[in-house]
């Protein structure tokens, strides 16, 4: 845990400069994480019942976790929950109000699982969506394309995305999430 925190602090120190606005901090963190993290398709396949698509021995599933911030100490391969957990830790360290949220998204090509994790950030008093997973192009250039960065919760790109209300505190959920985006 302590080692992970050191890595988080270093990411923030390298990406965030004094005097940056919260929006600039979010952009810098998104770029830094897109530059250093890779989507762990093997973990995704092994943990979503598609082990036949994985390029590893299913008995090695323990090596392919990808779900938490401590993956920064391994090979920087994560799935959506890892991206979101790491972004949350970095945003907190940078002084940006953020939330880790889960829910469902429309089915994606090659996927039989529509569960997903992403973040909300408070920028200029408004809670915006940041999805580092979908913002990381993973096309070999390790760059963020910015398409899922600080989106309004009603942005058409987010149509079909539903928040898991059970994972948010009822007493504060209305402070963060557009009610039309909550699961019944």
Language model feature labels by segment:
Residues 30, 81, 92, 120, ...:
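Residue-level recognition of well-ordered secondary-structure positions
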Residues 141-184:
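Low-complexity, Gly/Ser/Thr/Pro-rich intrinsically disordered linker/tail segments
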